[in-house]
Amino acid sequence: MDAKDVVNADQARQLVIERELSHVKVGVFDVDGVLRGKYISREKFFSALDNGFGFCDVVLGWDVKDQLYDNVAYTGWHTGYPDANVRIVPDTCRNLPLEGNALLFLGEFSDQAEQVCPRKLLQRVLTKASDMGVELFSAFEYEFFVFNETPHSVRDKNYRNMEPMAPAEFGYSMIRNSAESDTYQMLLDLAEKMDFDLEGLHEETGPGVLEAAITYKDALRSADDAALFKTFTKVALQKQNKMATFMARWSPDYPGQSGHIHLSMRDRSGKALFHDASEPHNMSQTMRQFVGGLQILMPEFLAMIAPTINSYRRLVPGYWAPTEASVGIDNRTCAIRIIPGSEKAQRLEYRIAAADANPYVILSAVIACGLWGIENDADIEVMVKGNAYDQKLPEHLHLPTNLMEAAQRFKASNIARDMLGNEFVDHFAASREWEVREFRKHISHWELERYFEII
């Protein structure tokens, strides 16, 4: 039996026994999309398959630097950071080829904690979709820069003068991917063995930047694949004394790093709901409603889509990232690109997304907004032709320009609360407000250079 064949607890036990494993890795993804976990003994794992296991809920109450939130209701010093129950999900079993024959299982928080658990959030949104008689399918595309650096060397260099894997721009280069074929093959092999297969992997425009397209799957599995791809791409490269960054934009000299999402919808019989050959661009009424919801609600939900301070460094004109809630037909300057095609190929591309977003959180936002559009008979308000950067949309389609503004819009959104729940909205908005507060404590190198001597 292989990891991808596991669908229930009995098969999970059988595979662990077959591989004679003394310990198993289990992990949960936190609010920022960081995988937190540990090795547990075989005996504890077998018990946890039936009863779950306790995991300190601090992982839902701190930031990416393990700094404790002081502004959230769910957990904190006021609760004593108790254990929260985690349910192991057998069908998330993955091989860990970088650790011999080891296995990884994902978990998800249950009971009260599930209200702020990103994976459970996506499941709730998908349950709503199922109640409406529809199923969502998606695929993530990631751009990421690779450096000839280690976690130690980048700190020694204070994140300056870092050496990229390749020296300059050379998009789609066959020279580069041949010269670096060991790295490319390592990533392709990893993806195959961990069952997040890549449809494509190529050199992008920028020094050492790659783009990976993950295979299309049902929405929950797609988010699992995306989150694991980001995590274990970093692991694999660090084992080669290299580093990958999925920051939205790491340098002012280059465009940002996208995390585009391709999305389609079917009914329970498998019929493609975005396709209607009798309509312009094969775009069905359902697709218009779905995209209308995305366009109308993008400003309110942007905190889930652009969740870091750095996210907003990417959203500037002329750098392959949208700046308004724009929609266009096969138009890569727009936030939402409608891709006409056959019944199988008709889809949308959500291009506002950056590589730094939590896959579960952003996919929850996209699907929730689209479902709202269907329920409320929304329509595309403005369709852009030509360069979206040269056109000005109505003010209500302008996007927040910083994380604090986005967090305030999200917190005040009644639609977000109806679609996602008060507990999640309050917790996530507070976590973004915390991120802004941490940033404001910081004195940048730009400020020192500008003011230290002269002012």
Sequence positions of predicted segments:
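Glycine-rich, acidic/polar active-site loops that bind/position phosphate-bearing ligands
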Residues: 1-455
